């Protein structure tokens, strides 16, 4: 993990963002880092990988980790996502707990707080997300609700990642509270692998075009990437669990998969800075979320 011995006085830290699905963690990390690192969607449980962004200042570095939303899993796939988050928490020294201002604190939030407490004595920062969606009075009620939790938060910071409201303040809070190491832990611009980023771009575009029932059953695997001087050739598989879902992904006359391919290709071209030839194949693997052998081979290994 450590990439170099630091000069005298260098400080660094790791903060992991946690919260229920769809509370704004991915939009937040993209805003904090200033890049599109993590997939965003209005559909829950969008993040399926551990995404890390790095913020550097003079003699200091913060690594921010985005995690899949913590939930009570019903399948081996859901269990695997929770295990990813637990591993990320174990490697952290501070936790950013995301609480959307427009949703009441419920059993899911308390489940997460209990899980965090069970893993270790972390310094906790409450991040009130999506404040652009409510009036000031509602924000004050949310802050009172957080106070009633009785948690020993190091700070409570309301933000709007979408409109970049108080994002710089949140960075300041991170640097004030999360610097526990004396070494540089990561390269300044560390990102997920190219293959992972491409698969996430494809899945993001697919989520924008598909019906509500499909997202949880959709998995994207980049099988092959070939490059020459002028173009990148990419072959990716889109896995679903039922033939009926495959028909939805394909669409009438293949229109939906064509639109997914076009929007994905444009996004990948912007990301890579090259022309892209994209081949998408839709495959059915029955109940893949429950297949430990499939998940181990394709996704969670």
UniProtKB/Swiss-Prot annotation:
GTP binds at residues 19-26, 66-70, 129-132. It is a peripheral membrane protein. InterPro entries: G_ERA_dom (IPR030388), GTP-bd (IPR006073), GTPase_Era-like (IPR005662), KH_dom-like_a/b (IPR015946), KH_dom_type_2 (IPR004044), KH_sf_prok-type (IPR009019), P-loop_NTPase (IPR027417), Small_GTP-bd (IPR005225). Residues 19-26 are annotated as: G1. The keyword Metal-binding does not apply. GO terms for biological process: ribosomal small subunit assembly. It is found in: Cytoplasm; Cell membrane. Monomer. Belongs to the TRAFAC class TrmE-Era-EngA-EngB-Septin-like GTPase superfamily. Era GTPase family. This is GTPase Era. It comes from Tropheryma whipplei (strain Twist). The gene is era.
